[in-house]
Structures are given as C-alpha cells and as structure tokens.
Amino acid sequence: MAEVRPYRPGDLADLYWIADAADPDGCADANLVGEVFAAPYAAFSPATVFVAEDASGVGGYIVGTADTRAFEAWAEADWWPPLRARHADPSGRPHERWTRDDVMAWLIHHYRRAPDEAVARHPAHLHINLLPRLQGRGVGRALMTRWLEAVRAAGAAGAHLAVRPDNARAIAFYRRRGFRELDVPPLKGARWFGLGFDAPHLL
C-alpha cells in the first residue's frame, strides 16, 4: 500500500522523473517537463506538495499552490529567468518543425498566466501525476484529499486546474472529486475545471 506523505527535498529527482514519465509526448531532455509542471512548486510552496511512496519508491505526486498569482509573480522573477538562459526560444522556427522539447522551451519563455475566470473564485491550482503501478488504487484520491486540505488551511477559497481535452480518464477523476468545468474562453490544448470550497464536494 502506498503512503501519502509531505514532500521532502530528497524527493525532487522523483518529481522530475515522474513528470517526464507521465508526459505522453516525451522530451529528449528528461528534466524539461518537470522544470515547468513540478519542480517550481517544490521550490515555491513545498508545504503544498505531497508524494505517494510504496515499496518501490515514490510513484506519484501532487504539486500546486494556494495562491496562483503569487506563484506566477515569483516564477517570473526567480524561476523562469535561469531556464530562459539555458533553453532557446523556438519562436523563430516554423511550428511544424518543433519537437516536444521546443514546445516546453516555448512555455518557459511565454508562460501563460492562468485566466482570471479561473483564478477569481479558485485561486489555488494543482498538477497531479501517478505512475501506472499506483493508478486505480485510490492513491490519486488520497493525494487530492491531502492537497485540498492543505490549500484550504492556507486560506484558498477554491482550486482550479487545466487538463488536456483528450484526457478522458483525468477528467472523470476530477469530476468525481467535485471539480466542474469552468466558463473560461477556449484555450488550445486545455479545458479548465474548478472546485469551490464553499460547495459540497467529494474528497
């Protein structure tokens, strides 16, 4: 049985590895996905990062922040600049020639603020990933429960997330947790869901 526990600094390599392993498209640089979607949360808000660990080691995580706008401001000042110096902006090349690494490098150089429509009532946000060995065993639910408790205790009024439109399994999971699709202007590659903490929801 997997144990859900708070993040420790020694877990950082696992965050990177799981982020890369869970990405359906894959990067040549195994750290790129984690640089965008996992590691910055461990640096900015380790108290709202949790991992799932079994006998084989850390096999899942949930990362996020109780304050999306504060995270975005911090990342713009402190997290993205050194990454932008290491990874060239691919904007000058034809999109049809971009690799997955180029897409991630573009995100580093042009990180999008979350839509106001998502943040206004749901200021926290999250990313969650599980390796296949931990899927379908209630581990995702346990991670989500711990994370929601943490950001609610930190004062967040609700949480939002973005999910790939074709990820039916993830969408079903979020709906079971009480997340509902938000009225957010369409953004290529994302559907937005939110959970208000003043409404009944399933933890």
Regions found by a protein language model. Give the residues of each.
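Conserved beta-strand in the GNAT
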Residues: 51, 57-66
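Short glycine/proline-centered loop/turn elements that form peptide/ligand docking sites
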Residues: 144, 167-170, 186-193
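Conserved acetyl-CoA-binding loop-helix of GNAT-fold acetyltransferases
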Residues: 127-130, 136-153, 172-176
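Conserved catalytic-core motifs of GNAT/GCN5-like acyltransferases
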Residues: 68-69, 160-162, 175, 180-195
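Conserved acyl-donor/pantetheine-binding loop and adjacent beta-alpha core of acyl/acetyltransferases
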Residues: 69-127
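Active-site rim helix/loop that mediates acceptor-substrate recognition in acyltransferases
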Residues: 28-49, 55, 111
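Conserved GNAT acetyl-CoA-binding A-motif
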Residues: 122-124, 151-164
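A short beta-loop-alpha structural element at the N-terminal edge
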Residues: 3-16
